[in-house]
């Protein structure tokens, strides 16, 4: 059975439901440990029924008339709630934007390494920002950079879609890829 928390101040209101002796109503609508409706009984009867099966009497709906109370193991109930929250948190995937930086003169071997990284990021469900930096006289050959970004776009069509078309931003050209929606 739930033991009173020694660290909790007496009379302090918390967001947890009333348990056992904390219930202030004279009569309660009792729900058994198996979920079966027991009807309206006195608080003492409900507490006795909970003690017989060595479980807690927990006030489920406090503002009902009379309040609805259920016989359950409160600590196990809290544990199950925390487990559900953890599982829900694990299932969530935070989409991140990963950045890959290239130059217009990037060689074939280096291009393949960057392409593998892009595909890995897209398979993980992340977005990929591809930045192509131009230095010095490379600015005169922006069409080479655009051709390289279009080649990347063609190579990743199976895994991702272009969310932002290639565009110049100062001395660099950028493009944003997003993962393809799974069916």
Curated annotation (Swiss-Prot):
Gene3D superfamilies: Translation initiation factor 3 (IF-3), C-terminal domain (3.30.110.10), Translation initiation factor 3 (IF-3), N-terminal domain (3.10.20.80)
Polar residues bias: start-end ranges: 1-13
A Gene Ontology molecular function term of the record: ribosome binding
InterPro entries: T_IF-3_C_sf (IPR036788), T_IF-3_N_sf (IPR036787), Translation_initiation_fac_3 (IPR001288), Translation_initiation_fac_3_C (IPR019815), Translation_initiation_fac_3_N (IPR019814)
Keyword Glycosyltransferase attached: no
Localization per Swiss-Prot or TrEMBL: Cytoplasm
Pfam families the record matches: IF3_C, IF3_N
GO biological process: ribosome disassembly
Task performed by this protein: IF-3 binds to the 30S ribosomal subunit and shifts the equilibrium between 70S ribosomes and their 50S and 30S subunits in favor of the free subunits, thus enhancing the availability of 30S subunits on which protein synthesis initiation begins.
Family note: Belongs to the IF-3 family.
Subunit structure: Monomer.
Name of the protein in question: Translation initiation factor IF-3
Organism in which the protein naturally occurs: Acinetobacter baylyi (strain ATCC 33305 / BD413 / ADP1)
């Amino acid at each position: 059975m739930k033991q009173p928390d020694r660290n909790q101040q007496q009379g302090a209101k918390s967001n947890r439901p009333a348990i056992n002796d904390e219930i202030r109503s004279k009569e309660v609508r009792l729900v058994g440990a198996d979920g079966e409706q027991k009807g309206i009984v006195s608080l003492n009867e409900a507490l006795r029924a909970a003690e017989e099966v060595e479980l807690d009497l927990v006030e489920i709906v406090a503002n009902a008339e009379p309040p609805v109370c259920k016989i359950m193991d409160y600590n196990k109930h809290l544990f199950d709630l925390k487990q559900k929250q953890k599982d829900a948190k694990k299932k969530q995937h935070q989409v991140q934007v990963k950045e890959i930086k290239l130059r217009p003169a990037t060689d074939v071997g280096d291009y393949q390494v960057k392409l593998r990284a892009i595909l890995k990021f897209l398979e993980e469900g992340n977005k990929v920002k591809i930045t192509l930096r131009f230095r010095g006289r490379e600015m005169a050959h922006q069409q080479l950079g655009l051709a390289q970004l279009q080649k990347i776009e063609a190579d990743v069509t199976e895994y991702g879609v272009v969310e932002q078309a290639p565009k110049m931003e100062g001395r660099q050209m950028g493009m944003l890829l997003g993962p393809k929606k799974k069916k």
